[in-house]
A protein has these predicted regions:
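Catalytic Walker B motif of ABC-type/P-loop ATPase nucleotide-binding domains
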Residues: 19-23
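Conserved catalytic loops of ABC-family nucleotide-binding domains
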Residues: 42-51, 59
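Conserved helical "switch/dimer-interface" subregion of ABC/ABC-like ATPase nucleotide-binding domains
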Residues: 35-43, 55
Length: 105
C-alpha cells in the first residue's frame, strides 16, 4: 500500500493534465482505498483521469466506466446505469459486494 501511495504522490507532483492510475489501489484494503479515493477526488476534478481497476469500488464514482472482458468493450456507462442493466458489470459488482461482506465477518 505504501509503495502505491508514494507513486500516486509522485504523479500528482507533476500536475499532469491526464492522470492514469493503473490498478494503483490493488494492494490496499477497501477502507484504505476509500480514504485514498476521497483524497484524490479534488485532484481529479478539472483533469482527465483514467482509473484502471479490477475492483468496482475503485471506479464507482467515475463519470464513465468502460468494462472490458478479454480485451473487448462489453459495456459502458455510469455505475448506476451499469448496475441497472444487469450485465457483466452488475454481476461483478454483486460478487465483490458479497466478498466484502464475507471479509467483514
Amino acid at each position: 500500500g505504501q509503495k502505491q501511495r508514494v507513486a500516486i504522490a509522485r504523479a500528482l507532483l507533476r500536475d499532469p493534465r491526464i492522470l492514469i492510475l493503473d490498478d494503483a489501489l490493488a494492494s490496499v484494503d477497501t477502507l484504505t482505498e476509500e480514504r485514498i479515493l476521497m483524497g484524490l477526488l479534488p485532484v481529479m476534478r478539472g483533469r482527465t483521469t483514467i482509473l484502471i481497476s479490477h475492483r468496482v469500488s475503485t471506479v464507482r464514482q467515475a463519470d464513465r466506466i468502460v468494462v472490458l472482458d478479454h480485451g473487448r468493450i462489453v459495456e459502458q456507462g455510469s455505475h448506476a446505469e451499469l448496475v441497472a442493466n444487469g450485465g457483466y458489470y452488475a454481476d461483478l459488482y454483486q460478487k465483490q459486494l458479497l466478498e466484502e461482506e464475507l471479509e467483514a465477518i
